[in-house]
Amino acid sequence: MDLPPLSLDQLSAVITAGPTPTDLYTSLSAYEEQACLLSATDPSEKDLLLEFYTAFFFSHLLTDQICEARALTRRIPREISRLDAMQTCSLLLRAVWQSKHTEIYKILRELPWPGRSQPLVQRYESYFQEKTLVEMSNSYETIRIAAAATYLGLDPAAVEGDIIEKFTACGWKWDSEKQLLHPKPVVTAPPKDDSLQNELSRVMALISNQGS
Amino acid sequence: MSDFLAYLTSAPSRPHGSANITDKCYDHQLRDLIAYLKQPGVAPSTADINGYLEAISPAVHSLSYLYLLRIRIQQLQEKTAVGVPNDLQPGGTLWNQTVKFLRSFDPIQIRYVGHEWRELVDSVANAALSVSKPILAVKMIRDALERLNTAGVFTSLHLMLVKLALLSSSYTYVLPVLDKLLCHFPSDTQNAHAGILLCSEHEPSTVFFTDSSGFSANLTYRDHLQFYMYSGMVYMALKKWDQASHCLGIVISAPTANSVSKIMVEAYKKWVLANLLGHGKLFSVPNLVAPHVTRVYQSLSKPYISLAEAFEKRDFQRLRTEISLGQTIWRADKNSGLVYQVFEAYDKFLIIKLGKTFSALTMPDVLQRASSCSKGSRDIEEFVVSLVMTKELRAKLSHSPGNETTTMLRFPLSSQSHALREEHIRFRLIQKEAALNTISRAITQTKITLETSHENLQVIAKNQKLAGSSERSGVVGSTEADGGGDLDEDLMGDGR
C-alpha cells in the first residue's frame, strides 16, 4: 500500500495516533526514504525534516535502539544536524548511553524541542522512568529515598511522604527505622526469540537435503 | 495495442487467476510469454510503455512489468547516453515504478527471469549511489531479497546489500537478511535437479538458484570473505559482539592454499577486538584454522596481540601505552573507534572479575581493588551502578542505613530473585521443548526422504525374506519381491 506523502500534518497524525513504540518506529522508518528525497536547504522542507528526524530519533530511543540512533545521527543531512534540536538529540543520546539520569531529565525537561515532538519527548520521559524503575527494582536490595527519587527524576526536596507513596504503590517497602526503601523485583518474561528455532530448522533441512 | 496488452496479461500470477492451472501448463504459459517478449521488434514506443506500466499490476503480471521497465530504462539510456537517466534517479517516474515493482513482484514468475531481475536491482543501487544516498537502495534491496526468498543461498546481491548498509550507516535495516543462515552457493546447473518446473511451489527454493539462473553474478572466494567481513562490521556497529565474532570467525577460518589474503588478516584484527570488547579476552583461533595460518595472523597483527595481552593481564599502564603507540596502526586499519572502546571494556571486565574473588565490597573497596580502572573515585559508583542496572554485572546493590552514604556491591551466587529464576527456567524449558520438536519433525522428514523409517525397513526386510523364499521355491520376479506390492506403494506414496 502506498504511503501518504510525508508532511507536517501526516507526521503529527502518526505521532498522535499513539501506536506502540515498535509500530511508531516502523511507520517512521517507512518515511525515511521520502525524507531522503527532500531538500535540507529548502526553507519550506527544512522544518519538516527537522520534525521528522527528531520524531524518528525518539522512536529509536523508545525501542531501545541506542546504537542505531547513533547511526541515524550520522545519516541526517548536515544542514539539519547542525540545528539546535538535533544537537539536543545528540546530547540526550550521549546522556542515555552514559546512563546519566539527572542529565537525561534535565535535557528532556529544560531544553527546547520542536513543537510536534513534544508528545514524544513526554512519552520518552515516562518510558525512561518506567524502565529505570524496573532496573532499580532488580538491582537494589535497599536504596535511599533521595537516590531513588533522583533515578526517577523526582524532586528530592519534595514531600518525603509523596515520594514514599509513589514507590510503595509499586510494591516497594519502606523501612522508616532505617530510612531505606526495599524494592520489589519485577518479574518479566525474557523476550521471545525465534532465532534458535529458525536456525535449527535450517540446519535440519540442510542435513536432510544433503542426505537425499 | 490491445493485442500486445492481451499478451502482457496472458499469464497472471498464481493467486490472481492461475491457481487452477497445472504446473506444466503454467510453465508453458510463462515460457511462451518470455519468448514473445524477447522477439525483436515487439518493443512498444515510449509513450505506449508508460501506458502499459500504468495498465498492468506489478504484483499480478510481474514478468511483463519487469520486461517493460527494462525496455524503458534501455530506451532512456540510449537516448541520454548516461548510465542513470534522470527518470531513474530517486524520485523520478521510473524510480517510483521500480520501487513499486520490487516491493510487490511475484517471486514465482521472477524465477524465469533472474538475470533481468538482478539487473534491475543493480540499476536501483547505481541510481541511489549516483545521488550519494545509498540508504534509498538498502531497504528496497532487502525487501526484494526477502520477497524472493533465496532460502539460504548466498548471492552477489547479499554482498551488495551489506556494502550499501555500511556506506549509508543503516545497520538495523539489513539484520533480517544478515541474521539468516546462508548455507548454499548457487548450485551447479549441471547438477541441478532435472525436470523440475520453475513454477513449482513444492520444491525447495534452493533448486531454483543455480549458477545460470541469473540471480547472482559470478561469485568468487573474495566475495564470500567480503560478505562476512562486512557483516561482522555491521554487527560491531550495533555492538552485537557475538554475532560479529561469528562472522569474522568464518573469514579467518576460510580454507587457504598457500597464502593468507589481506582481508583475512584484517578480519583477524577485528576478530581480536570484537572478542576483547564482547568477552574481555583473546580467544584461541577456531580449530579449522591451520597452525601456519595462525602464525601468519599473529605475526601480521602483533600490535593487536600485545594490546590483547595487556588487557588480559589487567595491566592498565601497558594497555594505555600500547594504545598510544599503535595510534597510526589503528587509524590505518580503520580500527580507531574499536580500540577507543577498549578502555570502557577494560573497566567493565575489571569490575566483573572482582565478583570471582569477593562476595561483597563497598564502593571505596571497589575503587581500591580496581585501582587500575580508568575511572576516578567520583565516577566509579556511577559506572558500577550502570553496569548492574543494565545487567552487564550480575550483582546487587544496597545502601546502608542511617546517614552513611556507602553503597555495598554484593555478588550473590544468583543475582536473580526466586520468582525471576523460575520464570527464566520456565522460558528455557519452553525453548528446549520447541527445539526438540523441530529436531524431531526434521528427523521424521529425513527418514521419509532417505527411506529409513521403521515401516520402510520392515517392508524391505519382508521383501527380502519373500524374495529368498521365492527363489528357494523357484518363483522368480514376483510382484512383492520387486517392491511393487500395494503396501509398498501406499507407504512410499508421500515419501517422494
From Swiss-Prot, chain A:
Listed PROSITE patterns: PCI
GO CC aspect terms: COP9 signalosome; cytoplasm
Every PCI domain range: 26-193
Domain of life: Eukaryota
Keywords noted in UniProt: Cytoplasm, Nucleus, Signalosome
Localization in the cell: Cytoplasm; Nucleus
Function in brief: Component of the COP9 signalosome (CSN) complex that acts as an regulator of the ubiquitin (Ubl) conjugation pathway by mediating the deneddylation of the cullin subunit of SCF-type E3 ubiquitin-protein ligase complexes. The CSN complex seems to link protein degradation to sexual development.
Family the UniProt entry places it in: Belongs to the CSN8 family.
PANTHER family: COP9 SIGNALOSOME COMPLEX SUBUNIT 8
Stated name of the protein: COP9 signalosome complex subunit 8
Organism: Emericella nidulans (strain FGSC A4 / ATCC 38163 / CBS 112.46 / NRRL 194 / M139) (Aspergillus nidulans)
Lineage: Eukaryota, Fungi, Dikarya, Ascomycota, Pezizomycotina
Gene name, Swiss-Prot/TrEMBL: csnH
Swiss-Prot record, chain B:
Broad class of the protein's primary localization: cytoplasm
Annotated InterPro entries: COP9_N (IPR055089), CSN3 (IPR050756), PCI_dom (IPR000717)
Any matching Pfam family: COP9_hel_rpt
Biased amino acid composition, Acidic residues: 483-496
Gene Ontology BP terms: cleistothecium development; ubiquitin-dependent protein catabolic process
GO cellular component, one term: cytoplasm
Keywords of this entry: Cytoplasm, Nucleus, Signalosome
Residue ranges of every copy of the PCI domain listed in the record: 243-411
Record's subunit section: Component of the COP9 signalosome (CSN) complex.
Family in the record: Belongs to the CSN3 family.
Name of the molecule in the record: COP9 signalosome complex subunit 3
Source species of the chain: Emericella nidulans (strain FGSC A4 / ATCC 38163 / CBS 112.46 / NRRL 194 / M139)
Top-level taxonomy: Eukaryota, Fungi, Dikarya, Ascomycota, Pezizomycotina
